[in-house]
Amino acid sequence: MDTTPLHCLLADPSFAACYDHASLNAADSQRLAATPQLAQRQDWQVSRALKQQTDLPAVSLSHSQGFAALLCAPQPLTAGVDIEFIRPRDFKALSALVCTQEEQDFLKTANCPSETFYQLWCFKEALIKAANLDFPSDMKSVGYVFDSGQPVGLRAGKQTDWYGTSAILADTMALACVWKGKAVTLQWQFFGSLKPNDLTDRQTI
């Protein structure tokens, strides 16, 4: 069976130096004209510099704390990406708001509570983007499918034909890529000072 490549481009704050205002696409140029202060934001600079590294159509984009993740593919795909800075939070209270009971029970058993929570959170946000659902109201309706207490799949509403990979980036960021349908090969590209070994704890579902 033929597979479709899905490219995930990753960049850290140092990649802001590669931002080129003159190379913005039409949509980003219009957005910048409406909100000029965006040009001074590191997230904008890094994410738009990342978009300028490929001629493939962008499928999904996420940025946080100067890091950015871009999904692109040579043909139309239903996919989404989310990247988040790992910071201390009241995970028990937050999971009660956005997680099913099964997900909450799973999080209670985690050896690395913050990383495990954020990888689930990133899966949820990426699924919401890909399935065109609403944040935050649909957070409980997306997430893990369980078997014997362990995540074995992903769901968005009643749809379970979702797949994805989550990881930790540079020890400070969590990210997740999701796609609909199995015939996809995820390929990573690194920019700025990032290297392949900065991507750890990869989990594919």
PLM region descriptions:
Residues 1-205:
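Core catalytic alpha/beta fold that binds nucleotide/phospho-ligands
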